[in-house]
């Protein structure tokens, strides 16, 4: 039988984080995960810290911040490498994903640089 303790934070020096879902201060540590008894959320504190540090900042050609799921437009004609096709200016890409690398926007079947895109 395992005993789980609920610890109420008394001072800011405690190591127990608030629940990221409901911000409850009543959390407990269960082997490798933290658990919130109020909302039932379970999380690994290392994952949350890594996701905060790894925020990807991508700007379009006009300096606007791009986010996951945005719609973007091409600002100039681009030749596809290894093909005779050309992507025309004004082509709209929906629901983009941001990734690390020199081609930092994933538009589904192709990857593009954010400098050739503007937010729609």
From Swiss-Prot:
It comes from the Bacteria. InterPro entries: YjdM, YjdM_C, YjdM_N. GO terms for cellular component: cytosol. PANTHER family: PROTEIN YJDM, PROTEIN YJDM-RELATED. Belongs to the YjdM family. NCBIfam families: phnA (TIGR00686). This is Protein YjdM homolog. The gene is yjdM.
